[in-house]
Amino acid sequence: RTCIPIPLVMC
């Protein structure tokens, strides 16, 4: 899965 840096890091 990919980690997307938004307000919080979702992996």
From Swiss-Prot:
It comes from the Eukaryota. The keyword Disulfide bond applies. Keywords: Amphibian defense peptide, Disulfide bond, Secreted. GO terms for cellular component: extracellular region. Signal peptide: none annotated. It is found in: Secreted. This is Tigerinin-2O. Disulfide bonds join C3-C11. The lineage of its organism: Eukaryota, Metazoa, Chordata, Craniata, Vertebrata. Stimulates insulin release from beta cells at a concentration of 100 nM and release of glucagon-like peptide 1 (GLP-1) from enteroendocrine cells at a concentration of 100 nM in vitro. Reduces secretion of interferon gamma from peritoneal cells in a mouse model. Has no inhibitory activity against Gram-positive bacterium B.megaterium Bm11 or Gram-negative bacterium E.coli ATCC 25922 at concentrations of up to 100uM. Has no hemolytic activity against mouse erythrocytes. The keyword Iron-sulfur does not apply. GO terms for biological process: defense response. Its main location: secreted. Expressed by the skin glands.
